[in-house]
Amino acid sequence: IEIIALVSGSRETPVWCMVYDDLVYEHEADIFANQQKFVKPLTAYDTFIANVEAGNPEYLTIKSIIESYNLKITAKRTNGSLCAISTAEYIYRKYGYHVLDNTIALCIATWQGDPNSLVSNILKGVAKLLVAYGDRLDMNMFKEKIGMYSLREIIRNANARNNGSLGYAESMLAVYNKRMKYPLPISKLYNKRS
């Protein structure tokens, strides 16, 4: 209302409002999540939390996966938190429950919960590897080999290779394949499914 008064130069300008009566908390949160994204830009975090409050089963499932690793969902990167919530949603929708679960587990185990390991490109890169190679990707070997490298090295190599998460997946695969008798073929990363 203040913005309209400022623009029109009058506090007497009529403003169209929608008033809801007798809403339960969950329904109000659902209206907020779905209407506000068209009115003002909301962060992925705001939309996610509103959908959780609305009781949306998909968002509750994603939240339970994240919290099962003693992580909090936050808007900013901190220790013990995941702030790349839109990436978690993306992985869950595109690849499913188990890939999101394994992705988070692998990132935490490989880099001992470093908050920089739970950023968008790392999460998507690990998910791409899990989808492309499935059971051929030995998770214990991944943790051992990739964990020996700092995240800075992985990020530097990824930026030199390709844009986005594919570069991160390529960088991690190159480290994983070092000194392997039968390395995983990089061509599988470019499959349409991953």
Q: Across the structure, where does each feature detected by a protein language model lie?
A:
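Solvent-exposed functional surfaces
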Residues: 10-194
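A sequence-level detector for short glycine-anchored, His/Arg-bearing signature motifs
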Residues: 1-11
